[in-house]
């Protein structure tokens, strides 16, 4: 296995070190290459993501990312120049966000309900393609547009992936959109789910408007198994899903090229948290969860399950104990 590591900014290097510690414990001998990308490189060279680095990243099986972002860099420079560019260059058309409430983790929802679903979010289309513009900027007559781009090809490949995941899970898929208002894009998504669903007669299909889905995520999260949705709605509901499962500090994600032509990238959802960087108190659990996603994607299902069980055991027993970053990694690695 060839792994590219982008530790990034803030607490990124700290949590990534613990994730790699767990990876080495469960799958020894991984060939690792670290890339210095983020604020430090930007300040030193003016570069964000050189073409040569993109070419090198393509030669790896997967990418492990820590966190990107620093207040010393103008907002959007690293996000667009690094994260979004990687997404489009490597065709990460699926953003995978598991949502599970682990034993021992408190949910803001009363009764700590059973929560275990996954959101399959389209990652390269929708309103995030940069298709828009503005005229008469700064005047009372300013007009600004953002065009949501949805292609039959792009929608179908994400929907097909979601059905495959539903078949391997509890065989239930929910399309989340807003078809009553976004009739053109919504119609494409709805028709595609109906068409692809014909090949999956064992998977039950449901539809919810995005506003209703946010309500049910709070009042009845157990109804969801696999959610498939577009880029914008997915961006919003995945953070809500993380919140009801204990917060983004326990949320992992995968940015996936389902064709496997390019390496997929796995990362904790949390940010770089520069205010606590270097103090050794950042929680690396989400980064370690990202390792489980990475291993599963690469077909190392037994190793992925071992990491997940070790994380579950750690969360079930740590309670309110405050642990150093390295202590968390060592505990989880020892439980493998």
Curated annotation (Swiss-Prot):
Family matches, as PROSITE patterns: IDH_IMDH
Q: What is the protein name given in its UniProt record?
A: 3-isopropylmalate dehydrogenase
Binding locations of Mg(2+) = 211, 235, 239
As recorded in UniProt, its EC number(s) are 1.1.1.85
Compartments reported by the entry: Cytoplasm
Top-level division of the source organism's lineage:
Bacteria
Q: Which residues bind NAD(+)?
A: 271-283
Please give the positions of the paired cysteines in each disulfide bond: none
The UniProt entry's GO CC annotations, sorted and at most eight, read: cytoplasm
Q: Which family does it belong to?
A: Belongs to the isocitrate and isopropylmalate dehydrogenases family. LeuB type 2 subfamily.
């Amino acid at each position: 296995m060839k792994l590219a590591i982008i530790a990034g900014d803030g607490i990124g290097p700290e949590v990534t070190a613990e994730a790699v510690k767990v990876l080495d414990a469960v799958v020894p001998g991984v060939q690792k290459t670290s890339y210095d990308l983020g604020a430090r490189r930007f300040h030193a060279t003016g570069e964000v993501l050189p073409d040569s680095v993109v070419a090198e990243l393509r030669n790896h099986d997967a990418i492990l990312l820590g966190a990107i972002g620093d207040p010393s860099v103008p907002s959007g420079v690293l996000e667009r120049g690094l994260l979004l560019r990687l997404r489009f260059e490597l065709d990460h058309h699926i953003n995978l966000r598991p949502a599970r409430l682990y034993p021992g983790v408190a949910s803001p929802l009363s009764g700590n309900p059973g929560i275990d679903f996954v959101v399959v979010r389209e990652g390269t289309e929708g309103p995030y393609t940069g298709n828009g513009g503005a005229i008469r900027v700064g005047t009372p007559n300013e007009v600004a547009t953002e065009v949501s781009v949805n292609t039959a090809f792009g929608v179908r490949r994400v929907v097909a992936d979601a059905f495959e995941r539903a078949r391997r899970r509890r065989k239930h898929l929910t399309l989340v959109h807003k078809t009553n208002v976004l009739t053109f894009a919504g119609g494409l998504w709805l028709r595609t789910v109906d068409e692809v669903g014909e090949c999956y007669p064992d998977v039950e299909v449901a539809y919810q408007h995005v506003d209703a889905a946010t309500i049910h995520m709070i009042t009845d999260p157990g109804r969801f198994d696999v959610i498939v949705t577009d880029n914008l709605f997915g961006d919003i509901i995945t953070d809500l899903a993380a919140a009801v499962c204990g917060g983004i500090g326990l949320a992992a994600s995968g940015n996936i090229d389902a064709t496997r032509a390019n390496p997929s990238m796995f990362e904790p959802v949390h940010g770089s948290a520069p205010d606590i960087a270097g103090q050794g108190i950042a929680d690396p659990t989400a980064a370690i969860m990202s390792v489980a996603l990475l291993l599963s994607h690469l077909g190392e299902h037994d190793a992925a399950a071992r990491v997940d069980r070790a994380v579950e055991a750690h969360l079930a027993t740590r309670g309110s104990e405050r642990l150093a970053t390295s202590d968390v990694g060592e505990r989880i690695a020892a439980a493998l």
